[in-house]
């Protein structure tokens, strides 16, 4: 690496469904490869589990409870040496509604 800082786009993806997340990551990586950028990833981050404890009965039986959980899966994709063509292609990319995307330049 040179002393100059390289240009990099960091894309963070979050979703409840890991299959949807993986297909979105594959689309992003393929788009970056088509425009001659060098993608790194998808890098899996730890899955966050959120557990909710709810009473089963509205009146008595405090000991009877039910647990629900949501799992948030996360991935990072880094794209090095992006061109304006890469950025345009990523902006036009159609991704599912269940995937949350954050882009940092």
Swiss-Prot record:
PROSITE patterns: RIBOSOMAL_S10 (PS00361). One of its GO terms (molecular function) is tRNA binding. The keyword Ribosomal protein applies. PANTHER family: 30S RIBOSOMAL PROTEIN S10 FAMILY MEMBER. This is Small ribosomal subunit protein uS10. It comes from Acaryochloris marina (strain MBIC 11017). Belongs to the universal ribosomal protein uS10 family. Part of the 30S ribosomal subunit. The keyword Ribonucleoprotein applies. Keywords: Ribonucleoprotein, Ribosomal protein. InterPro entries: Ribosomal_uS10, Ribosomal_uS10_CS, Ribosomal_uS10_dom, Ribosomal_uS10_dom_sf. SMART domains: Ribosomal_S10. Pfam families: Ribosomal_S10. GO terms for cellular component: ribonucleoprotein complex; ribosome. Involved in the binding of tRNA to the ribosomes. GO terms for biological process: translation.
